[in-house]
């Protein structure tokens, strides 16, 4: 069941708040059809104020139950006297301007003298309890048309809205908030959202009692009840007519931006927060030095193949992948030559073993394979002791030559190992003497230690900067554990 505590008098209270006080107290004469409708719900006079007319129309809608039970602001009056008066099959009480126009079409203005006598009559009527009309009431001399009345009311309402707009510009934010609350409380769009029953005594209530009952809910009940339903029943057009709220979203780029109510300028510490550079240390083998303020364009090296400017740390060109010139020491070529010479010496030593003769000549394969079948048996018999003697003499010479050759090979191997050690030491000393690969100015004296190993490729200052920025080792990409200052003698 829908809420039966309803009354269109809320429409009257809310709608009449839009009308100036002078127009609310002005008496108007309803046309016969509208007068018939008003008298059907207890009206007894011929002239009424706008408050009384709106109240009686609300009573009529409530008595006939012309409103929709689900959407109570919609009124269906197609087959009713109200539809004949307004000339529409249905309407919504949220369209208050349309309702004013339909009511004004059925009203006739009353002159000032006529309105003054009628007002005094309406005030005396509740006290005396008589329904007699004033016999001295003079007929109206000039009756302006309904169109003139509508234009006059609209002009006055526009003037009032302009004056209210000018007053709102001078108000403080707190007063504006309170006025906004008051305007929402008396919004005409909330007319039939919650219709309340104002007349418990039936249809015999007088005009003065009806006006008092109209003012009572508008100032007491609506302030408490409308705030709960203002979000559902609020009309955008009516709200925009009463007030407008404009604001700008504050941002960091705003000139008047402040971190507190008093406001203060940004300090150097605040600036440092925005200068933090985040380095992504993923699985990539290269590191970016574009955001490093310590490395300038003067530290970059130019590729000899494609003339591309590259950061100081990578050893290869990022465009053509060419090795940087003078990146590795020149001893690498000498090592290759020494290795080739060592291989040749070993091959020659293997070829000379077992082929030495007493006279120092080398036997060829053809000499060793000469046949002895041509000699006679006698010659063989004579030569056998000589060959034995020669064998006796040749054995010590062969063994001595083998020992000599082995000693020479051992000496050569020792010399080669010494030369290799010297070359390694010289290359190590050269690498240590070379400048830092990052700053290209200081010597390599900062060893980057990770676990049980370390890499010596930068100076101590640059290595400390890498450690402070939580960057990995540029060579092996392992996390840096500590930096050791290295000295060379």
Swiss-Prot record:
What do the Gene Ontology cellular component annotations say? centriolar satellite; cytoplasm; cytosol; glutamatergic synapse; nuclear body; nucleolus; nucleus; postsynaptic density
Q: Where is the SWIB/MDM2 domain?
A: 26-109
- Residue positions, PTM Phosphoserine: 163, 183, 238, 240, 244, 258, 260, 394, 406, 423, 427
Maturation and modification? Phosphorylation on Ser-163 by SGK1 activates ubiquitination of p53/TP53. Phosphorylated at multiple sites near the RING domain by ATM upon DNA damage; this promotes its ubiquitination and degradation, preventing p53/TP53 degradation. Autoubiquitination leads to proteasomal degradation; resulting in p53/TP53 activation it may be regulated by SFN. Also ubiquitinated by TRIM13. ATM-phosphorylated MDM2 is ubiquitinated by the SCF(FBXO31) complex in response to genotoxic stress, promoting its degradation and p53/TP53-mediated DNA damage response. Deubiquitinated by USP2 leads to its accumulation and increases deubiquitination and degradation of p53/TP53. Deubiquitinated by USP7 leading to its stabilization.
Tell me, using the record's free text, what induces this protein: By UV light. Down-regulated by NPAS4.
User: Which sequence ranges does the entry mark as zinc finger (RanBP2-type)?
Assistant: 297-326
For the region Disordered, give the residue spans: 1-22, 114-183, 197-235, 250-271, 342-426
Task: Report the locations given in the UniProt record.
Answer: Nucleus, Nucleoplasm; Cytoplasm; Nucleus, Nucleolus; Nucleus
Motif (Nuclear export signal) positions are 183-195
Identify its protein family.
Belongs to the MDM2/MDM4 family.
Q: What is this protein called?
A: E3 ubiquitin-protein ligase Mdm2
Look up and give the organism this protein is from.
Mus musculus (Mouse)
